[in-house]
C-alpha cells in the first residue's frame, strides 16, 4: 500500500526488475487489483467499520487531518553532516504555538550510557536538571558499533521534568524512544566530529520545527555566556578533541574494522554501501604519507628457519 502511494507521487523507479521476474510497475498493478487486497479492504469496511484508505493514508489526507511527517534531520555546527530526530515523539507540551521545540541549555557530557543513567537517577549535585542538554558521545560505529541507547530515554520518563531534558548523541535510537532525542550525529566524536569537542557547561541551542521538518543543533556559548553560532564554529574548530574519547574496551576487532571502513567511505551519513574507490584512495594516501615519514613496514621474510 505504501508503494502504491509512492508510485502515484513519482518516487519509485517502477521499471526496475524484481525477484518475481517482473518490473516493480507490473507487480504493483497486480497487487492493486488482486483478490487478496480487495478481500482485506472489504473485511475492514464491513466487519471493522474502518475505511481502508485511513489505515495507510495518502499525504494529502494526512495533512487534512493535521498529521505531520515523523522525521526531522537537524544540522548545525555540532552536526555538519546531519542528525535525526523523531520529531512527532516530542511532548507537545514543550512546543511553542508554531510547533517548534526551542531550547538553549547547559551541556552535560557523557562518554558511556551507564554514566548518563547514573546522573539521571542521582539526587546529588551531579543530577540532571530541567533544561539540561545531555550529550552522549562515543556511541557511533567507531565507539560501540552504533549501539541503541534506549535506556537513557526510558530513564528520563521517570523524571517529572524529563520532557524538559534534551539528548544529543552520535549513537542511535529505536522507534520506541520518545522525547527530544537527537541521534546519528555526524561526524561521530571518534571520527573527529565537533560533538567530541563539547565540554560540560557549554551552551547548546536546539531548534526542531515539527511542522516544517527543519532543525539545528549548535554550540552558542560557554561558561554561562551566550554567543552565537559563528562563535561556536570558530570555537569548535580551535578546540582539541577531548582526551577521554575512546571506543568501548569490548568492541570486537571486526566491528572496529567495519567502522573504520565506513568512516573512510563517508561516515555515518554516507550510507550503508561502501564506496570502494574512496576507501582505496584513503588507504593509498595513508600508505604514501607513512612512506614519506620514513615509517616503512619491516619486510617479512618468507624463508624457513
Report the location of each language-model feature.
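Catalytic or ion-coupling anion/metal-binding cores of large enzyme and transporter domains
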Residues: 1-164, 168-305
